[in-house]
């Protein structure tokens, strides 16, 4: 608890059972802190404000955005992937799965 945004725990992309708490003054500072990272796999907010929830979904710089939900995992039928330096390449699930798991080839045959 009471970590700062410049601490190593908050500047690296950690995959593990880790929770970090950064105190902020208001929603605007929270969004700024959330976006102040080179990574952007997943981001989330817990709020009762529909205004903040909608604004966060549109402005969080992440490939997946959750409101009042855990930030780990997605349904199998939706695209899974990040933004910025997270999750390079095409999305791994949903309609993007074909692009992720195949190589497109154009071929012609003359009869």
Stretches with model-predicted labels:
Residues 1-111:
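Conserved C-terminal structural/oligomerization subdomain of aldehyde/semialdehyde dehydrogenase
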């Amino acid at each position: 608890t009471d970590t700062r945004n410049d601490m190593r725990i908050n500047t690296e992309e950690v995959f593990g059972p880790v929770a970090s708490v950064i105190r902020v003054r208001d929603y605007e500072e929270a969004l700024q802190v959330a976006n102040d990272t080179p990574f952007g796999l997943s981001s989330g907010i817990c709020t009762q404000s529909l205004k903040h929830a909608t604004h966060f979904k549109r402005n969080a710089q992440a490939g997946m955005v959750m409101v009042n939900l855990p930030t780990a995992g997605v349904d199998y039928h939706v695209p899974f992937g990040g933004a910025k330096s997270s999750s390079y390449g095409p999305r791994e699930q949903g309609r993007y799965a074909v692009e992720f798991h195949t190589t497109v080839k154009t071929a012609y045959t003359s009869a």
